[in-house]
């Protein structure tokens, strides 16, 4: 039986990834010799037996106790909070390990290329939205009712915006789901690369942002 890879609204999931490969990527010993596949990486609460999760802070110990994940990236100090059904994978730096595995599942999550297929809003399915001048819209964008969009704003592919939202001028929205009744001010950038990185001797390691932190 081939299981469907978990879908993601913005990035393509390249799973499954085996436990053997996870250990190879992280340069750690594989204590389990049997072949186990992971279909996604998820937070403690969302994870299931087919996904790998992570536990990096004691403040999440109550959630960790109830996780449904079969394996968890964690530290030696935190491993005893995990339930019996969840095997710890001990690493020196949990978040750096999460970044490395997330990059394998979602390699294009580290890219920050602009959407070169945007259209003028007048030529898109969102033309009925009240908008200013020079507004650009990507493919598969959904905008709810009673929304306003200011001048020179770009809303890139797959972005969903709820009802009663106000988007300011000179704003870029990418890789985002905006709920109802949200106001975004002028000159905002949402969904692009953030400040998530880990210092390294050779170069900074970028932390992929896929909505699990």
PLM region spans:
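Terminal amphipathic alpha-helical/low-complexity segments used for targeting or macromolecular assembly
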Residues: 1-122, 181, 187-188, 192-206
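Structural signal for interior beta-strand "rungs" in well-ordered beta-sheet cores
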Residues: 54, 119-213
């Amino acid at each position: 039986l081939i299981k469907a890879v978990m879908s993601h609204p913005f990035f393509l999931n390249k799973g499954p990834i085996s436990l053997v490969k996870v250990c190879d990527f992280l340069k750690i010993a594989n204590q389990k010799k049997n072949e186990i596949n992971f279909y996604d990486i998820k937070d403690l609460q969302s994870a299931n037996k087919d996904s790998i999760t992570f536990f990096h802070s004691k403040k999440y110990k109550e959630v960790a106790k109830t996780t449904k994940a079969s394996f968890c990236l964690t530290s030696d100090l935190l491993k005893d909070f995990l339930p019996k059904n969840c095997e710890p994978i001990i690493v020196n730096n949990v978040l750096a390990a999460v970044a490395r595995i997330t990059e394998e599942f979602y390699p294009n999550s580290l890219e920050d290329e602009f959407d070169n297929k945007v259209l003028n809003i007048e030529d898109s399915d969102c033309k009925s939205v009240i908008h200013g001048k020079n507004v650009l819209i990507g493919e598969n964008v959904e905008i709810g009712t009673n929304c306003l969009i200011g001048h020179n704003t770009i809303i890139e592919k797959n972005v969903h915006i709820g009802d009663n939202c106000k988007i300011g001028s000179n704003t870029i929205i990418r890789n985002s789901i905006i709920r109802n009744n949200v106001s975004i001010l002028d000159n905002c950038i949402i969904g692009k690369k953030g400040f998530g990185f880990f210092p390294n001797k050779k170069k900074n390691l970028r932390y992929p942002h896929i909505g699990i932190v």
